[in-house]
Curated annotation (Swiss-Prot):
Cited InterPro entries: NAD(P)-bd_dom, NAD(P)-bd_dom_sf, Polyketide_Oxido-like
Any matching Pfam family: NAD_binding_10
Name listed for the protein in its UniProt record: Uncharacterized protein YwnB
UniProt xrefs under PANTHER family: FLAVIN REDUCTASE (NADPH)
Transmembrane segments: none
Lineage: Bacteria, Bacillati, Bacillota, Bacilli, Bacillales
One term of GO molecular function: oxidoreductase activity, acting on the CH-NH group of donors, NAD or NADP as acceptor
């Protein structure tokens, strides 16, 4: 597959890039600053997400949105998401997979309370969580593109090990055998590539959890 990764120089984006390369896919890092791409032997499209056009993304079978917003700029998650929705309408054969957040996952079966609505949710993560949640809403109201939104577990561990396995859920927080909502970046990247290779969640959100080792 031809896969473009927006934000490939970030932690999550880099893990997804490595996993895609490991599986033999043709990967392009879509970044604002080419010098920040850590991997060697990867094609680079040096362009801001807001400058991307339908022509830029038409060559890809899938585009992964691992866009990272700086503190105080969290609203850019929504704006970047809308920019991508707009250009994807003219790139019908390119699928979008969004690296989402856990904050918009529900904690009750009735789906009335989200993780970010609970008193335990760290206040410093609220701006990111709420804006990523808004991005999900925009996608859910769009029927003219092919998208998937992948929410990590509550503890999204950049230093965690690659166990090679994970469990899936839909819109609710799920936990592992120890009762923890946990996934490493490496196992999350596996889930991303599995979904791109064998799509099971077209135009919906799903979530993943794994064991911490």
């Amino acid at each position: 597959m031809k896969i473009g990764i927006i934000g490939a120089s970030g932690k999550a984006g880099n893990e997804i890039l490595k996993e895609a390369k490991k599986r033999g896919h043709e990967v392009t890092a879509i970044v604002r600053n080419a010098s920040k791409v850590q991997e060697q032997d990867v094609a680079i499209l040096e362009k801001d997400v807001f400058e991307l056009t339908a022509e830029d993304i038409k060559p890809f079978d899938a585009v992964v949105n691992a866009f990272g917003a700086a503190p105080g700029q969290e609203h850019l998650h929504v704006e970047a998401g809308r920019a991508l929705i707009s250009i994807l309408k003219d790139a019908k054969h390119t699928r979008l997979l969004v690296v989402g957040g856990a904050g918009s996952l529900f904690v009750d079966e009735a789906k009335t309370t989200r993780l970010m609505d609970t008193p335990e949710f760290p206040k410093e993560y609220l701006p990111t969580a709420s804006n990523q949640g808004e991005n999900l809403k925009d996608l859910q109201q769009t029927d003219s593109i092919s998208w998937t939104f992948l929410s990590p577990a509550a503890f999204f561990d950049p230093a965690g090990k690659r166990t090679g396995s994970y469990q899936k859920g839909k819109d609710n927080v799920i936990v592992n055998a120890k009762g923890d909502s946990y996934i490493s970046y490496a196992d999350y990247a596996i889930a991303v590539l599995d979904e791109l290779e064998h799509p099971e969640h077209k135009n919906e959100r799903f979530t993943v959890v794994s064991e911490a080792e």
